[in-house]
């Protein structure tokens, strides 16, 4: 397969979606996020934090103070797909994220 075919195949595949957490091990504070593509979200957050690019300034400040070793990055839940490439999962992800925010008394990423 050439690059264009691989790109088209990727676009025709439903990616794993769900909820993740970034936890400050030192103070126990939890940040919850959702993603339509879970495969790269942890690495994306780590990259942003390491390069002081994260949009959550409170999380960024904590990361700058204690470093990566002071945090855990975990997948909390996956959203079951409907096998429809055109379906918009935004509402379902928001509901699932809100449930985890309430359950863990956490902040949003």
Question: Where are the predicted features?
Answer:
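Structure-specific nucleic-acid interaction/processing domains
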Residues: 1-32, 36-109
